[in-house]
From Swiss-Prot:
GO cellular component, one term: plasma membrane
Organism the protein comes from: Streptantibioticus cattleyicolor (strain ATCC 35852 / DSM 46488 / JCM 4925 / NBRC 14057 / NRRL 8057)
UniProt similarity note: Belongs to the EamA transporter family.
Domain EamA: 6-137, 150-281
InterPro entries reported for this sequence: Alkyne_AA_exporter, EamA_dom
Listed name of the protein: Probable terminal-alkyne amino-acid exporter
UniProt keywords, alphabetically: Amino-acid transport, Cell membrane, Membrane, Plasmid, Repeat, Transmembrane, Transmembrane helix, Transport
A Pfam entry, by short name: EamA
Transmembrane segments: 6-26, 32-52, 65-85, 95-115, 123-143, 150-170, 178-198, 212-232, 249-269
Phylogenetic classification of the source organism: Bacteria, Bacillati, Actinomycetota, Actinomycetes, Kitasatosporales
Amino acid sequence: MKLSKAVWALVLTVVTWASAFPAIRVGLDGYGVAGLSLSRLTVASVALAIAAGPLGVRRPRARDLPMIALCGATGMSAYQVLLNWGEVHVPAGTASLLIAIAPVFSVLLAAVFLGERMTWAQIAGSAVAISGAAVIAVAGGHARYTTSAWVVLAAAVVQGVYHFATKPLLARYTGLEVACYAMWAGTVFLLPLLPAMVHGFATAPVAATASTVYLGLLPSAIGFVSWGYAVARLSVASSTASLYLVPPVALVVAFVWLGEVPPPLALVGGALGIAGVMLINRRTLGRRREASTPGRR
């Protein structure tokens, strides 16, 4: 059976986003947390700036700049720094399991600040997912792992804030446009880390530099473009369901690339986390249809 271009775009998105977690581990060797964070965003920002014209990315309105700044500060700047910091001691696959529960925090924020009523399924799903995160956090058996796991969980929280903050913007811009604006804003916020980036480019091993460029070009730039292409042509249910594949693919890539095997208890916690998110999404897919479609103005 011949697969459509949209399905192939979805496959590309899942694989590139999943491969980002082990690629971070490689990039940290030579760049460190600060250098890798800015380097990845810089590469992605340049790539998206070049592609912005052909892709029809419009200039944002001035009144939307504060919300764009919030999206950049949370979903790009803070997320990159926290995830990279956490992956210093947390295996790549384990980190992907923690990040997978980010939708939980988006739902909780919507309930608190937008007054969106949570269903029993959402409440139960949130409890299950957060319980899974707690299990993952203690799965390593030593203090450095546990501390780093909570840092990765903090990255999931700011990612949830990002998804929450994009809601009003997605009423006026495409998903790709919002991603571009946030990427560019996030890069500006991390410019104080420029010395670390320059030092990394000058001294890091070739593998670390190649991994850093890969992170910027594929997961951060091409990944957003392919995701936008796919969700504009496929059902929201299919697109959302595909994201459940990111952690399993990340686990496989991390094993093949780095030889990493996560703690068994982390896999149990990850299964709980994904199950909780699936329970939440059963009740939210209908409401997320408009916000998840990049072609919507």
